[in-house]
Swiss-Prot record:
The lineage of its organism: Eukaryota, Metazoa, Chordata, Craniata, Vertebrata. It comes from Homo sapiens (Human). This is Motile sperm domain-containing protein 3. It holds the Pfam family Motile_Sperm. It is a multi-pass membrane protein. It is found in: Membrane. Residues 1-25, 143-171 are annotated as: Disordered.
Length: 235
């Protein structure tokens, strides 16, 4: 397969494709649909790797077909694999590169023609399709590309502390909340233990007398346990 600039044997002027002194006659016999994607080529002048597009050509038939890529402006493009063969029921990728991305070529439409013919030296043309090509100007001027954005970005509100200071302010609060939770939990466990201990005059208890609590102590433990329950429910 040959690489290089696309040929201009079919499309050589600004007129409609297929007309003119060098226009090709329409295909005779069965016509094969030319399936290509994308249907139009849009090049961007600000592409980092250079303005290029990938054109995929499909062969829906059961036989191999020969293809050619023609163009109205061959000096502006380089087509890799400008002609070759497509296997049956398969596809091939054609890389097209715009080699003249200058301002005078912005928004100028060119035309490519994909021509399919039967396999062989003098195979008849069985299908052709024309697609348009256009070069778009950069989104930003070239002299501004690669420079930092001059527009200032909004900063945090005046009363908002820096992230580092905020981190150091929130960290002690988290430690305080953790220690308070542990204190409340320990107090609740002690209160429940007081409620489970027997009274001094309770008979049948196997615990020593020192672990017997009075009724007043149980009332205080029940009151503290109620307060802790309210605190946990509110949080």
């Amino acid at each position: 397969m040959r690489r290089g600039a696309p040929q201009d044997q079919e499309l050589v002027g600004p007129g409609p494709p297929g007309r003119g002194s060098r226009g090709a006659p329409p295909p005779l016999g069965p016509v094969v649909p030319v399936l290509v994607f994308p249907p139009d080529l849009v090049f961007r002048a600000d592409q980092r790797s250079g303005p290029r597009q990938l054109l995929t050509l499909y062969n829906p038939t059961g036989t191999a077909l020969r293809f050619r890529v023609l163009c109205t402006a061959p000096a502006k493009y380089t087509v890799f694999d400008a002609e070759g063969y497509v296997k049956p029921q398969s596809c091939i990728d054609i890389v097209i590169r715009h080699v003249a991305p200058i301002p005078s070529h912005y928004d100028v439409q060119d035309r490519f023609r994909i021509e399919l013919s039967e396999e062989g030296a003098e195979g008849r043309v069985v299908g052709r399709k024309d697609i348009t090509s256009i070069l778009r100007a950069p989104a930003y001027p070239l002299e501004l590309q690669g420079q930092p954005d001059p527009a200032p970005r909004p900063g945090p509100p005046a009363g908002t502390p820096p992230p580092t200071a905020r981190h150091f302010q929130e960290h002690p609060r988290q430690q305080l909340a953790t220690s308070s939770f542990l204190l409340f939990l320990l107090t609740g466990i002690v209160s429940v233990a007081f409620l489970l201990l027997p009274l001094p005059d309770e008979l049948g208890s196997q615990l020593p007398q020192v672990l017997h609590v009075s009724l007043g102590q149980k009332l205080v433990a029940a009151y503290v346990l109620g307060l802790l329950t309210m605190v946990f429910l509110r949080t």
